């Protein structure tokens, strides 16, 4: 771990995974003091992700302390392709990236992180994907003295965090009638939601992934969701996160049998459904699974005092039933002044890739599904 001091603050660069593992308690305390935390920056999620996907020697986690107390952190890693880049830990299986700043010392912490990042990125471009518009990383971008660029990234759909029945009650006309009918169908069948305790998480993850595979039978499933490393990551991370309240697992049972399972993640103002699995027999019974799941996650968000219910990445048409607001994540590129040509090159690479994707999707509509599946693969530095 390398370190330097500036303005009474100690800035360190953690490159050792064991040292990162030892940060759990103070990292989680900082996560709770942050104004804009997402579940994907929890220590449980990042530590587990690195075990499954990280590469030795690539860890680059910036830490800021005042009098020994952690007040800022940026969980990054080094990749070499297509060029040297500092990118977020968490890869493509994480929907959002942010830095962590102690809310009471955010100004000092972000300034120190900026200075630390300037040193850590002496020969690299910083490429921060999936940054929410209100993220703390926006403060870092705003104060960055070197070259920078803001690009658009994934679109997410969001709703206010309130019980779904309340939202449906305000809907008028045929749309409201259809949604109320779908909810009554679930209730009439007697499907019951059961929260899974921490010690039940390993078995519940196995059930969720089996149901997820079954629901995609005959269609193009994200292959990463069927791999052992992904299952192992969820078992490790979600077990801890259920314990500290940043995750919830819910099984839906019909006559005692699990017919659907859902994993939701939450922290700060945000709750979102991350992954689910459902028995195809529910479709045969005309059950609207997305409506059933959304009602449960919305209730969790409301009960937990959250203000935002995120439908996470993707603007699929079925999400529009509820009248969500689209929120576009951003991609922030940063570099030292002398590395501006490299930043512009990276900017061009991203633009060319996006144009190619749009061209293929326009000329070959069937490729849209393939692109969405492949875009979800955990390719580091994507």
Residue ranges and their predicted role:
Residues 4-6, 89-93, 185-188:
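Short, flexible turn/loop "capping" segments at secondary-structure junctions
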Residues 11-86, 131-154, 162, 169-285:
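A conserved beta-strand-loop-helix scaffold within acyl/acetyltransferase catalytic domains
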Residues 9, 95-97, 191:
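Short amphipathic alpha-helical segments
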């Amino acid at each position: 771990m390398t370190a330097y001091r500036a303005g009474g603050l100690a800035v360190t660069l953690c490159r050792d995974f064991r040292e990162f593992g030892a940060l759990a308690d103070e990292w989680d305390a900082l996560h709770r003091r942050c104004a804009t935390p997402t579940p994907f920056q929890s220590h449980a999620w990042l530590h587990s992700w690195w075990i499954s996907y990280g590469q030795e020697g690539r860890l680059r986690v910036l830490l800021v302390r005042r009098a020994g107390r952690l007040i800022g952190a940026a969980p990054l890693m080094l990749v070499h392709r297509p060029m040297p880049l500092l990118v977020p830990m968490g890869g493509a299986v994480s929907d959002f990236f942010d830095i962590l700043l102690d809310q009471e010392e955010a100004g000092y912490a972000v300034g120190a992180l900026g200075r630390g990042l300037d040193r850590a990125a002496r020969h690299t471009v910083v490429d921060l994907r999936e940054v929410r518009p209100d993220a703390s990383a926006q403060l870092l971008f705003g104060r960055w003295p070197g070259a920078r660029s803001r690009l658009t990234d994934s679109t997410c759909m969001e709703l206010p965090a309130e019980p779904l029945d309340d939202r449906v009650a305000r809907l008028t006309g045929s749309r409201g009638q259809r949604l109320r009918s779908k909810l009554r169908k679930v209730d009439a069948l007697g499907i019951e939601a059961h929260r899974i305790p921490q010690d039940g998480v390993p078995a519940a993850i196995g059930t969720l992934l089996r149901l997820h595979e079954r629901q995609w039978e005959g269609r193009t499933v994200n292959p990463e969701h069927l791999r052992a490393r992904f299952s192992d990551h969820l078992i490790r991370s979600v077990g801890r996160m259920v314990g500290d309240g940043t995750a919830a697992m819910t099984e839906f049972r019909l006559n005692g049998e699990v017919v659907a399972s859902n994993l939701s993640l939450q922290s700060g103002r945000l709750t979102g459904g991350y992954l689910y699995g459902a028995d195809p027999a529910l479709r045969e019974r005309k059950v609207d699974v997305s409506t059933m799941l959304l009602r449960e996650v919305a209730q969790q968000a409301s009960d937990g005092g959250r203000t935002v219910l995120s439908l996470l990445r993707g603007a699929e048409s079925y999400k529009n039933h509820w009248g969500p607001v689209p929120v576009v994540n951003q991609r922030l590129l940063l570099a030292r002044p002398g590395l501006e040509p490299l930043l512009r090159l990276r900017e061009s690479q991203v633009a060319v890739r996006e144009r190619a994707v749009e061209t293929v999707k326009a000329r070959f509509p069937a490729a849209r599904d393939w692109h969405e599946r492949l875009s979800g693969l955990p390719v580091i530095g994507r």
